[in-house]
Amino acid sequence: MCGSKPTDALRTLPERAFRLRARLIAVGLCAVCFAGLIGRLFWLQLCTGGWYTQRALGQQLRDTVVPADRGKIYSADGALLAANSSCWTLRASPREMPEEKLALAAKGLAEILELDEAKLLEKFNDRRSNDCLLRYRVERETADAVRDFCAANGITGVRINQDSKRWYPQGEFLASVLGFTNVDNAGVSGLELEYNDTLTGQNGVVLTAVNAWGYTLAQSYETELVPVEGSGLRLTIDANIQHYLENALNYAVQEHHVAARSVGIVLEVNTGAVLAMATTPAYDPNQPRVIADKAARAAVDALSGKERAAALQLAQQTQWRNKAVSDLYEPGSVFKLITCAAALDAGAITRHSTFYCGDSISVAGTRFHCANHKRHGSQTVTQALENSCNQSFIQIGARLGKQAFCDYFAAFGLREPTGIDLPAEPKKSLYYTADRMGPVELASCAFGQSSKISYLEMAAAVCAVVNGGKLMQPYLVSDILAPDGSILRHNQPVCKRQVIQPATSATMREMMEAVVLYGGGRNAQIAGYRVGGKSGTSQKLDSADEKARIASFVAVAPIDDPQFLCLVCLDEPHSWTTAGGSLSAPVCAEVLEQTLVYKGVPRATDTGSADAQAAALPADGDSFDGA
């Protein structure tokens, strides 16, 4: 027994070594596995943890956007022009709806919301869906009907979320200036588009917890970020003056059977502030896709298919277009104010210069005549303006010369956008440059044909003629407002440049008053106020109708202390005449008289002699090239 112990000891050595190696291998394997686990945890926690967290939150949270109200728009006198009204968006979560009541829900909701029952039931049967839109922005009555139906029938899973939409409380009023918004409350045209970033608020959000099956948990789990209303606008537009302009313009359009859209503008002469701006016929920005003009709507309804769709789109784009800013026109004899001011300022003529008007005048082989072939004989510059004499202004243009004419044309801002804070202003007008202008082109441009400018450009240029020679930038927004009504930014008037000398401007004011007292502008006279103006009746050179005319008039009052300018243009009137002095001048007089009284400008007490003298003088008729 004793002799076997060494042998047993030798036999246990390999076993011990084997066991040790086994332990070491086991420990090593454990270490490797542990290291792998640590590495995986490191990767999951630090490298991809954010991604998994977001996925988990996405499954556990449902976020509902709470749209912010757009900023409100007010007139200068405080009238609310654009605001927001409550509406409701209806959504459903099919997986939360009782399966046995899906058919009942589809039938009832389809009836209330005027939807297709079969299609609605198909949506509800998709139990994987957690969200489907039923109707977007419905009125309170519809939302209440859905709420009552669901409550009465024990239907869950239908969500009624309060929303807001743009609302224009005064309908068509100022529509072409305000513009409108789309279904997402983003500006599409007008001030809504130009100031979209300013008016747009910061949306809020409601985070709602959901369980593993997608069902909404108790309201105590909700988190809400409150929406922030956008900034508001206070305009230079005075609601009272805007009403004066729209009422007078609408009456004239109906009275004289105006075929195309007509324009009216009222500016503050010394600042460029737009007090009123209208394009007729207007449209309702609450229903911008409904064609407001009856004739245009009838023409669209008479078509079908693709033709109708194209005609509808064109009609909509036409009614949305602010013609006062976006369209170009031949200004006609109103432009003679620019030619006259330029020639006086350049020293090419004086107010006492005389010109002769016979049967016609020949320029490079082309004959020009005055309206109705009138012969005015010898006349001063003032008389030529009173008579709107084409032949005299052809001679004035020739004395000024094409280079100086083009220089003043540019200086009066007629080759560039006015810079008004509205979209869709043309980048440039249509005109001749000096290197492309021959004697005939200079002659026709001198009395207001052969060039096309915007209505607003013409109004701004005449302001410079009478306000001492300063070209002011027209503008519409006076103040940017915080939601509480406090002023965030005030816009100051901008003088672009000095165009003519103050003395020239003073002379032009006297001559414009003579036009209203003794010439073709007598229909613009206002009892107790001194008024200056000029008429125009321009031929539409790009129209297929050779008889198509634009009857226009521009008036300034009081002319001895210029404050307000009114430009009215009736596009294609079909009346007893097409003369601007007969059709448009009375509109200017009505608007300016109401404005002067409203603004508290006192009437003169003794104007009888001037009125009687003016009434005793014969009016010089005006036509397409002599108005």
Regions found by a protein language model. Name each.
Residues 2-13, 82, 211-224, 269-334, ...:
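Beta-lactam-recognizing serine transpeptidase/beta-lactamase-like catalytic domain environment
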Residues 1-303, 319, 328, 403-413, ...:
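Periplasmic/cell-envelope proteins involved in peptidoglycan metabolism and beta-lactam response
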